Design a protein with these regions (language model features):
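Small-residue-centered hinge/linker elements
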Residues: 4, 10-144, 153-244
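Glycine-rich beta-to-alpha transition loops that act as phosphate-gripper elements at the mouths
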Residues: 147-155, 256-259
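Secondary-structure end/capping motifs
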Residues: 237-267
């Protein structure tokens, strides 16, 4: 019998399907102490040890305390919701928490695999790749499977991380793909500053140190530099997709023009 354990940060509940029980802490009520005693008795009876929760800003920051025992085999369920970025306190996806949780699961002998639910438009190249590598490490060291389920969207970085999955499932209304890399928008406000009578001065150690500045023109050389960085990241993306989907790189390049695909198209 293999249950599931939800490690997500969306609410203050701990959920499992061992015995069909769910537990939620209540505060400020006269029955609080009685409820806690009853829950503890039930947990001891069925051999479940509930891990300690720490909360930061109302969000669950960690659901693992040391080498926790779940009292039986289980599959971890993780959510990747929102932009995949390296911001520990973001309200949706928490990169530090996710990386820590996956690393802890490696040493959890009761864990038998991971299911990741994705609803993300993507994120930074760095954090997407770091999460992908952590999942590949988990698979390599544990020989356990990783499954993905695509919800509303799993695009760009959200698709990238799924290349670590053994299997991918998607809602029929999912939008995915968007295989590509881009810089942030580069603005040129020199014309506006001229109209306002504002002049700027920047002292640099080299002609390309200030490239991308809103107050200087992007030269052909600088455009080539930025394009080379984008191309390098794109080539890495293509390689990851080719490996994860068992496709040739040439075929991936044919379809990886940045567009999104429906679930049926991506299949």
């Amino acid at each position: 019998y293999i249950g599931y354990r939800d490690y997500n940060m969306r609410d203050n509940n701990i959920k499992d399907n061992h015995g069909g029980k769910s537990r939620q802490s209540t505060k400020g009520q006269n029955s609080w102490l009685i409820a806690v005693i009853v829950v503890l008795v039930l947990m001891l009876t069925i051999g479940i040890v509930v891990t300690t929760l720490a909360y930061i800003g109302g969000a669950r920051f960690s659901s693992i305390s040391g080498k926790s025992s779940f009292g039986g085999n289980s599959v971890a369920v993780l959510d990747v919701q929102g932009e995949i970025g390296d911001v520990s306190a973001r309200a949706t996806y928490n990169h530090d928490w996710t990386m820590h949780t996956i690393n802890e699961l490696i040493d959890d002998s009761s864990n038998k695999g991971i299911v990741i639910r994705v609803n993300s438009p993507g994120g930074s190249v760095y954090t997407s790749d770091e999460l992908y590598e952590e999942l590949m490490k988990y698979k390599s060291e544990t020989k356990r499977p990783v499954y993905f389920y695509f919800q509303d969207q799993a695009a760009s970085g959200g698709y990238y991380i799924a290349m670590a999955g053994d299997k991918i499932y998607a809602n029929r209304n999912t939008w995915t793909g968007s295989i590509g890399v881009k810089t942030g928008t580069l603005y040129d406000v020199r014309g506006l500053l001229d109209k306002l009578g504002i002049k700027t001065n920047t002292i640099t150690s080299g002609r390309n140190k200030a490239m991308g500045s809103m107050t200087t023109e992007l030269t052909d050389e600088q455009r080539e530099i930025l394009q080379s960085l984008i191309d390098e990241a794109y080539n890495q993306f293509v390689t990851i997709v080719a490996k994860g989907r068992n496709m040739s790189e040439s075929r991936v390049r044919e379809i990886a023009d940045g567009r999104v695909y429906s679930a049926s198209q991506a299949k």
